[in-house]
Amino acid sequence: MTPQVDTVSAAAATPDVAQPYKELGLKDDEYARIKEILGRRPTDAELAMYSVMWSEHCSYKSSKVHLRYFGETTTEEMRKSMLAGIGENAGVVDVGDGWAVTFKVESHNHPSYVEPYQGAATGVGGIVRDIMAMGARPVAVMDQLRFGAADHPDTRRVVDGVVRGIGGYGNSLGLPNVGGETVFDASYQGNPLVNALCAGVMRVEDLHLAFASGTGNKIILFGARTGLDGIGGVSVLASDTFSGDESGAGRKKLPSVQVGDPFTEKVLIECCLELYAAKLVVGIQDLGGAGLSCATSELAAAGDGGMRIELDKVPLRAADMTPAEILSSESQERMCAVVTPENVEAFMAVCRKWDVLATVIGEVTDGDRLVVTWHGETVVDVPPRTVAHEGPVYERPVQRPDYQDALIADTPDTLPRPATADELRETLLRMISSPQLCSRKWITEQYDRYVRGNTVLAEDADAGVIRIDEQTGRGIALATDASGRYTKLDPYAGAQLALAEAFRNVASTGATPKAVTNCLNFGSPEDPGVMWQFQQAVRGLADGCVALGIPVTGGNVSFYNQTGQDAILPTPVVGVLGVIDDVHRRIPTGIGLEPGETLILLGDTRDEFGGSIWAQVVHDHLGGVPPKVDFAREQLLAEVLTAGSRDGMISAAHDLSEGGLAQAVVEAALAGETGCRILLPEDADPFVTLFSESAGRVLVAVPRSEETRFTRMCEARQLPWVRIGVVDQGSDALEVQGHFSIPLTELRAAFEGTLPKLFGAETA
């Protein structure tokens, strides 16, 4: 039985019908503008389309005025290797030898609190489809995770579901998870962050874009059937319990969190790649947030004509779905392609080969309207650009918070510091066993890091490294970083510190950083203080990219990350892509590969503890000024690391960030299963040397035979260095001479024991 629907003609004849636009997230003036655009009230289906496409998630209505700064500051020199940038499904970069890499990071924060497993799983699935839509084969994923306090009763539920969701979906797709970050902080209680990155590889000529052109070309929906899951996911996130019943009484209990099937997506990947190889696709768009509303309006808006869709031809998973529900559904594993009439049968044949359901649901028209019919009646008739690109843009109030001065003035300088050898030893053990700094092995071992056989480096390396060409050994490096604590103290500097660390992590593997993506996680845009944080972070990131000469290729904004009046720590996640001409020269993290290595600390160490993990773990303190950022130094450091890798002068490298030198030495020693002796400079404060979080520093292990050549290179380039110790392959301890010694077994127990104790040796 076909449900009664609200048609365009009915809407024109009944202008005074009350509509639930506020419940769908639209404001009074936004609803009035829709009526002005259409010259009448919208139909139920049109209202559904505008509400999801004009949502903060899809329209960027509060962030657009600030995001323009990325484009304004990107120079032609920075753009020269960029094949696709902001506005496309994902950024694409020419990485040489005819290869292109596409990469992007997206958020799935709110769904991952409501339904952690499916929220995280479909976050992975969604970003993978963005990469597929560019014409690439997905080759790796990463994740940036933020949870509430590690000892909070609800944190275990969220951690368990999110980690299993990421692993379950990514492992089933056969995609290696090569790195990321996991942070615990009370500000994320009730509002975890799940940011997933995916990278894909293709030949330069295989790039595909999302546009519908060519009058008469067919619109084909292929992949999974359309159900009721995910409706309202991008506009009004519901939290009813999922009953699994998509018909009758159970319908109202369906979650707004999407339900994923990785095996359907795995087949969809191979199907898409064969379609691309056969040149059967004119334009393509994945179905993610806002579902068909987004896919059809964006394809039509980017094309040179209009589009007509027959909605009753969409294969459904649930009985009696309305047009509004079909257009709003965020059911996963679906793609929408534009195909010439003569290629439709060949397209369908490929889909049949892979057992992928495919249906012609419409065609490109010569008009300028997006028209959607339902059993012959018109339920949508709109200018597509007004849905996809011409939504409201707000220049919201920006105000530096009143508390900012007091926060900066509350420095950690007066906090008690460890003074004796025993106190230094205990501080080190306390920090490496804290949830903030302890090993993430319990999490990462639930992910397959080496599937497909092209992973060269993965967690716990500074960056993931993937081989993309078996013949030449060409590869890419990926790193993601963020620091909400630094960004809270100074949003401009905090975003720059995240960029600097991701840049440095990529360089520490021997790769050359080439491009940036981001995911900007903030509180409510209706709070002027949050908008100030956002504005400053965007400017800091953009200015940093100019200083480094690498472009922002795209990104994502996630607002409303707060519980009540309490916003999360502002968390701009930055991803950096690097290129390495031969993965055989990659630099690992673990020391001890060469006998008698010398440990050298590159960069300057200063007394910088504002926002540090030491202040948090030992004193529960957040205040002061974050570490200084010096992008010229970061570039110099990257050049030295790349040259050292190319000339065989570096056998291991590990960047210094949270936890400082002490954390870096512990991680490098445990990774290499090798002891070492650290000799602190006589004129330096041992506490500052061990725990400072000054930026622009890397610990390198240099073969004894290369020490003179390497240090001369550093001096010639005016890069500060200090000989900080030696690798002692006959030792099973970390010794800080004149202060303390800790057996590697004790270090490992402290470092690796925390998460299993908190969350169980295995996930439930």
From Swiss-Prot:
Cellular localisation: Cytoplasm
Keywords noted in UniProt: ATP-binding, Cytoplasm, Ligase, Magnesium, Metal-binding, Nucleotide-binding, Purine biosynthesis
Keyword Secreted (UniProt): no
EC numbers: 6.3.5.3
Cytoplasm is among the record's keywords: yes
Annotated binding of ATP, by residue: Y60, K104, N518, G555
Pathway assigned in UniProt: Purine metabolism; IMP biosynthesis via de novo pathway; 5-amino-1-(5-phospho-D-ribosyl)imidazole from N(2)-formyl-N(1)-(5-phospho-D-ribosyl)glycinamide: step 1/2
Residues the entry annotates as binding Mg(2+) 1: E106, N556
UniProt xrefs under InterPro entries: PRibForGlyAmidine_synth_PurL, PurL_linker, PurM-like_C_dom, PurM-like_C_sf, PurM-like_N, PurM-like_N_sf
Gene3D superfamilies, per the entry: PurM-like C-terminal domain (3.90.650.10), PurM-like, N-terminal domain (3.30.1330.10)
One GO molecular-function entry: ATP binding
Active site: H57, H108 (proton acceptor)
Catalytic activity: N(2)-formyl-N(1)-(5-phospho-beta-D-ribosyl)glycinamide + L-glutamine + ATP + H2O = 2-formamido-N(1)-(5-O-phospho-beta-D-ribosyl)acetamidine + L-glutamate + ADP + phosphate + H(+)
GO-annotated biological processes: 'de novo' IMP biosynthetic process
Binding site for Mg(2+) 2: D130, D286
Binding-site residues for substrate, renumbered to this chain: S107, H108, N109, H110, R129, Q258, E330, S331, Q332, S558
Protein role: Part of the phosphoribosylformylglycinamidine synthase complex involved in the purines biosynthetic pathway. Catalyzes the ATP-dependent conversion of formylglycinamide ribonucleotide (FGAR) and glutamine to yield formylglycinamidine ribonucleotide (FGAM) and glutamate. The FGAM synthase complex is composed of three subunits. PurQ produces an ammonia molecule by converting glutamine to glutamate. PurL transfers the ammonia molecule to FGAR to form FGAM in an ATP-dependent manner.
Family from the record: Belongs to the FGAMS family.
Record's subunit section: Monomer. Part of the FGAM synthase complex composed of 1 PurL, 1 PurQ and 2 PurS subunits.
Protein name as annotated: Phosphoribosylformylglycinamidine synthase subunit PurL
Natural source organism: Nocardia farcinica (strain IFM 10152)
